[in-house]
Amino acid sequence: MASSTALFCDTEAWKDLKGHVEDIKKTHLRDLMSDANRCQSMMMEFDGLLLDYSRQRAPVETMDKLLNLAKAAQLTEKISRMFNGEHINSTENRSVLHVALRAPKDAVIKADGKNVVPEVWNVLDKIKEFSEKIRSGSWVGATGKPLKDVIAIGIGGSFLGPLFVHTALQTDPEALESAKGRQLRFLANIDPVDVARNIKGLNPETTLVVVVSKTFTTAETMLNARTLREWITAALGASAVAKHMVAVSTNLALVEKFGIDPNNAFAFWDWVGGRYSVCSAVGVLPLSLQYGFSVVEKFLKGASSIDQHFQSTPFEKNIPVLLGLLSVWNVSFLGYPARAILPYSQALEKFAPHIQQVSMESNGKGVSIDGLPLPFETGEVDFGEPGTNGQHSFYQLIHQGRVIPCDFIGIVKSQQPVYLKGEVVSNHDELMSNFFAQPDALAYGKTPEQLQKENVSENLIPHKTFSGNRPSLSLLLPELTAYNVGQLLAIYEHRVAVQGFVWGINSFDQWGVELGKVLATQVRKQLHSSRTQGTALEGFNYSTTTLLKRYLETSSEPQM
């Protein structure tokens, strides 16, 4: 067992896998896929989900070695420590308990010796009551009109997760029916264009604004909040703010100072990281206002089902653990720096951007949890696009350029099926034909010999050859309901945690986002003094000075 100050790459389990890479270098996926027993062993089913990872560049013995790696990394203990509320976010001295946000009412999950589940449900019950008042029209705006439009202001984890879930549910029949006559929009960027787009076509009289900021000091969020407060007060007067703005925050003093009734503030806790907060009031409040709490509760139950699977299932059948170990294999041993997330569902168009943050903010680290520089890369560059759109965009590179492991996500039953008379298959079958074909195209490729048999001209054979041996996995969901969306979210959250646990890093802090904020403060002060007092640029390097000079000379901002 490695000591706390040793790097995990020095363990025998890690070194064993390093040697194993050399052993399998010449093994092609064509050969691996011909072994039916191996393929069968790489199918995992849970609660209607089917995972197929047989197209990973991993013989059976690779999986055995990866499970040994998990043991050497004390993965069982680390998962238990997370669920037990220990302060595994050591740099911020915090528990990591997003699992408590979707736990059943009778569950016991402790932080600092106290069961937090009752607190979670107090907030959920408050959200349920408030959202029902808004949706029923018993709570009205300053002019007596029902509030049918919601703008949620937040950034990063306060925006990407809720946006993903909202987009996924927009065409779900149950959610669609529940949202009739309502709109939900998300304002994140401080670019005034984002404000203009969000308020376009909306009437302040029928709009409710949800301001999401734990401290109520997040620069971008609070500037946007002040901007929409001005929009409301200009139309309805200052007293309207209390009727048209609510908060998700723990800083009740600043909430009240802003003009929002503290009774209309919904709490969350230090043990919830921003990118893991979609199951807290951050996501549950705006989503409940749009779809009703009963729909959102199903989303929470789906996530909880995966939490329980993750906590209790042996690793060889544990979907998030297997996915996490395979990601470590692809990144640290096979040297693949990226991952494509490819949902064959337009409803999941915002899934990849959310997981991009969850993954890259969590595992984009350069030191171990003990502060030692890492001699290996962690994390991967996550990107993606729904199929088949991505096929006409970046799949060319995936097939014949760099090797990029792919996650294919398919849905058995469409949210909005279409059957056209005279067509060979339904629209959804056409979509799914591509879902099933692409992983095989990546795995098998096409050889020069095959092309010769097809009488392809010699000069085109090099251009039409596909090397294959490009890894992917397939995740098949029975349908895309609120419950399934919750499952999908939790699978990826826990997968990311597994990667971090194995790499020996802290996946729950994000110091990398701080430096740019600090430097922006200096620029902000300079812009203010230059615009109001004509102060000369000072304290910047030549490059930044030149850019700032051009910006100040040519922009037409009014004097503050």
From Swiss-Prot:
At the top level, the lineage of the source is: Eukaryota
Q: How does it assemble?
A: Homodimer.
Q: Which pathway is this protein engaged in? A: Carbohydrate degradation; glycolysis; D-glyceraldehyde 3-phosphate and glycerone phosphate from D-glucose: step 2/4
Q: List, from the UniProt record, the residues annotated as the active site of this protein.
A: 361 (proton donor), 392, 517
Protein's GO biological process: gluconeogenesis; glucose 6-phosphate metabolic process; glycolytic process
The record ties this protein, via InterPro entries, to:
G6P_Isomerase (IPR001672), G6P_Isomerase_C (IPR023096), Phosphoglucose_isomerase_CS (IPR018189), SIS_dom_sf (IPR046348), SIS_PGI_1 (IPR035476), SIS_PGI_2 (IPR035482)
Q: Which family does it belong to?
A: Belongs to the GPI family.
Protein name (database record)? Glucose-6-phosphate isomerase, cytosolic
One cellular-component annotation, GO: cytosol
Q: Which reaction does this enzyme catalyse, per its entry?
A: alpha-D-glucose 6-phosphate = beta-D-fructose 6-phosphate
Any single GO molecular-function term of the entry would be: monosaccharide binding
Q: Which residues carry this modification: N-acetylalanine?
A: 2
- State the top-level EC class: isomerase
Q: Which UniProt keywords apply?
A: Acetylation, Cytoplasm, Gluconeogenesis, Glycolysis, Isomerase
Annotated EC: 5.3.1.9
